[in-house]
Curated annotation (Swiss-Prot):
Role: Probable S-adenosyl-L-methionine-dependent methyltransferase that acts as a component of the wybutosine biosynthesis pathway. Wybutosine is a hyper modified guanosine with a tricyclic base found at the 3'-position adjacent to the anticodon of eukaryotic phenylalanine tRNA. May methylate the carboxyl group of leucine residues to form alpha-leucine ester residues.
Biological source species: Schizosaccharomyces pombe (strain 972 / ATCC 24843)
Functional pathway: tRNA modification; wybutosine-tRNA(Phe) biosynthesis
Record key words, sorted: Methyltransferase, S-adenosyl-L-methionine, Transferase, tRNA processing
Pfam families for this protein: LCM (PF04072)
Keyword check for Methyltransferase: yes
Protein name, UniProt field: tRNA wybutosine-synthesizing protein 4
PANTHER family listed in its UniProt record: TRNA WYBUTOSINE-SYNTHESIZING PROTEIN 4 (PTHR46529:SF1)
InterPro entries found in the cross-reference section: Gal_Oxase/kelch_b-propeller (IPR011043), Kelch-typ_b-propeller (IPR015915), Ppm1/Ppm2/Tcmp (IPR007213), SAM-dependent_MTases_sf (IPR029063)
Family statement: Belongs to the methyltransferase superfamily. LCMT family.
Name of the top EC class for this enzyme: transferase
């Protein structure tokens, strides 16, 4: 290799090592916050860092889930009773203390397990110095004092840490054998936690092929994926982030989906393969007690962003031979994004639905000049009035907003600021139109800890306070209903307490609305619609009180009982499971154009799999419950349909604000407004 190429390679290696530093800081934040599964008292991360910044709740939860996913995969390997000695080889270990956490764990007996941490020689030398300088970590592995005399490596009975470039497979094989691995008789687990993904395609394939030649080898690779193409806003920001760091994700470009990752392992010699996204791990494999404890650590409401993160990472497990193989997923569920391959045959593959296109399509139109003064907001409240749209609250780049804007639909449009002192700087409030000139703003939150119960009326251009809810509410869903000439508002109260409430416009008070179905009253972030034409409604998406996805789609009606009180009566609609998956979203919005028996569901964050662009907008025909796609014109910069407000006026669909923070990679914020025109497909 020329001197120029050597310098280039060393420069790339340094950039990859920087990602290790960032990862350890984030995991240290998880530990410091007290997330479950991280020992209180002794820090496993502090010896490797000079500072301990606190990350955002979204980043903390993401890294905690990543750690739990790796541990889950390792535990399945340790539980697999083969009678053999086990070896766990962490390829690109960096400063990760996984081996120390497992060696000091009382959950599993690691007496017959030997750990090998492998990385660049410079990284390992620093790692060894840090371990030796910390009495807690050194006490775990250095009790027998059998370490390398020159101080650059550690070699003890059950732990080895040594430097080796993963491209030098002959050297790696020789070192592992030298330090005790018996390739013929040991069960070996190779871990790569966002490490091999930085290797060029040919190099990573050589590594995987080399691993497969051992008779009882297994893998746990944790890597990025792009399930909805690289044009998806989250994937786009993620890829750009790593490229700017000088660490392009070569493995992601070559194998962007779980289907392509399956092929990667199969063609390189593995007889048993399981590939799943981390969303599947979170929804189906993560211990529910751990998730409950996680909720108690710090306030959290970034669910859309969290699900984007979960759906853009994969867990790859493979066994070189069927003899000795074990499962990560024992009983596959149709909602899982999961593939299982067993020697020449795909046993489980959850293929997405192919939507039939609707008679509608949405064509991008120019934004009225007057809207340039409207800020870009996340989670604003948006409501249609007779010939205008009102936008209130939300989160701007300057913080939470209390401002309200009245946007006229007449002529070329106009915008007027109509903020009043009674409004609160908040986001996530529910808003419902009572009639053509009246709407109600309900609840919302100032922060994840400060939830509101206020109700504010806007009628004929004037604001007024109304009786508050019986309890605080945000992430709620609401609809207006007419019955015998009277107006009512039905509210699914959302977080934090749930339940159903009903507002009578004539009595001007809230009451509990009776409903016996927890699939209805316990949801938050759901899409609620009422058809005045059919005198029935539909409910889809959302999460329950345990923050678990609800996939059942309900039809609901309002029944007036003898005691002059309404009751919600529901039935589960018999949709194909792939339709249920498609409609399982949080934060989606509903509009209709003329015929309210054909609501259009727009956007939201899917809770089982990433929504493809052609699936962002779907029409549910409540007459026969057929579901069709509504094609949205794709532009160079795709908006992200989460945390937005929506208006459907005439034949125009108007998206206000929206966007998301893309984990620790950056943000993707929409323009202040995006307009579409409904046309025949």
């Amino acid at each position: 290799m020329s001197n120029k190429n050597q310098r280039k390679t060393k420069s790339k290696d340094r950039e990859v090592r920087k990602t290790n530093d960032s990862s350890i800081l984030s995991k240290a934040s998880v530990e410091k916050c007290g997330y479950p599964g991280f020992t209180v008292g002794h820090s496993y991360y502090q010896p490797f860092i000079q500072k301990s910044p606190r990350r955002s709740p979204s980043v903390n939860r993401g890294y905690w889930t990543r750690c739990m996913a790796i541990r889950f995969a390792v535990y399945q390997f340790l539980k697999n009773k083969t009678g053999k000695r086990k070896a766990i080889v962490n390829l690109g270990a960096g400063y990760d203390p996984l081996a120390f956490q497992l060696l000091s764990s009382h959950e599993y007996n690691t007496d017959d397990v030997v750990f090998y941490d492998v990385d660049y020689p410079e990284t390992i030398e620093n790692r060894v110095q840090m371990i030796r300088s910390d009495s807690f970590l050194s006490s775990i592995v250095l009790e027998d004092k059998e370490f390398d005399l020159d101080g650059t490596e550690i070699h003890t009975k059950n732990y080895h840490s040594f430097g080796c470039n993963l491209n030098l497979l002959n050297q790696l094989e020789s070192c592992l054998e030298k330090y005790g691995i018996d390739y013929c008789n040991d069960a070996i687990l190779f871990i790569s936690e966002v490490a091999a993904v930085y290797m060029p395609r040919q190099a990573s394939e050589k590594l995987i092929r080399w691993m497969s030649k051992f008779p009882d080898a297994h893998s746990c690779f944790f890597e990025q994926i792009a399930p909805a193409t690289f044009d998806h806003p989250f994937a786009n920001v993620m890829v750009k982030h790593f490229k700017e760091w000088g660490t392009p994700l070569h493995g992601l470009y070559a194998y962007p989906t779980i289907e392509s990752l399956k092929s990667r392992w199969v063609k390189n010699g593995w007889e048993y393969v399981e590939i799943l996204d981390v969303c599947t791990f979170w929804n189906f494999l993560m211990d529910s007690k751990l998730k409950h404890l996680c909720e108690m650590v710090e306030p959290f409401d970034e669910w859309e962003e969290f699900y984007f993160f979960l759906q853009h990472y994969s867990i790859q497990h493979a066994s070189s031979k069927l003899v000795g193989k074990y499962d990560l997923v024992e009983s596959p569920d149709p909602c899982m994004q999961y593939i299982r391959y067993v020697k020449s045959e795909i046993i489980f593959n959850n293929s997405p639905l192919t939507l039939r296109n609707s008679i509608y399509s949405l064509k991008r139109t120019d934004l009225p000049a007057c809207l340039k003064e409207l800020p870009s907001l996340r989670l604003p409240a948006v409501c249609d009035l007779d010939d205008s749209v009102i936008v209130q609250g939300g989160l701007s780049t300057a913080g939470r907003s209390k401002d309200a804007y009245l946007i006229s639909e007449k002529d070329d449009g106009s915008i007027m600021k109509i903020t009043t002192d009674s409004l609160t700087s908040c986001m996530g409030q529910s808003v419902v139109s009572i009639d053509k000139k009246t709407c109600m703003f309900i609840g919302g939150r100032e922060s994840p800890k400060k939830i509101l119960s206020s109700c504010i009326y806007f009628a004929d251009g004037n604001w007024s306070d109304f009786p508050s809810l019986p309890y605080a509410s945000h992430r709620a869903s609401s609809v207006s209903i007419k019955h015998n000439g009277s107006s009512y508002v039905v509210l699914l109260a959302g977080k934090p307490f749930g339940g159903c409430l009903i507002w009578s416009d004539s009595k001007r008070k809230w009451n509990t609305l009776k409903c016996k179905d927890p699939l209805f009253y316990s949801r938050w972030g759901a899409c609620l619609h009422w058809s005045s034409k059919l005198k029935k409604g539909i409910l889809c998406g959302g999460m329950n009180e345990l923050n678990e996805p609800v996939r059942e789609v309900l039809e609901w009606e309002m029944v007036l009982r003898d005691d002059d009180h309404f009751e919600i009566v529901t039935r589960v609609l018999n949709f194909d499971v792939q339709v249920e998956i498609l409609l399982s979203r949080i934060g989606s919005k509903v509009v209709f154009f003329g015929d309210d028996s054909k609501p259009i569901i727009v956007g939201g964050a899917a809770v089982f799999r990433t929504i493809l662009w052609e699936e962002e907008s779907v029409c549910i025909n409540m007459n026969d419950y057929s579901v069709t796609g509504v094609c949205i014109e794709e532009t160079e910069k795709r908006p992200v349909f989460t945390m937005f407000g929506i208006s459907g006026m005439g034949n125009h669909l108007q998206i206000f604000g929206g966007g998301c923070i893309c984990f620790s990679f950056g943000s993707c914020l929409n323009e202040n407004a995006t307009f579409y025109k409904l046309v025949s497909a």
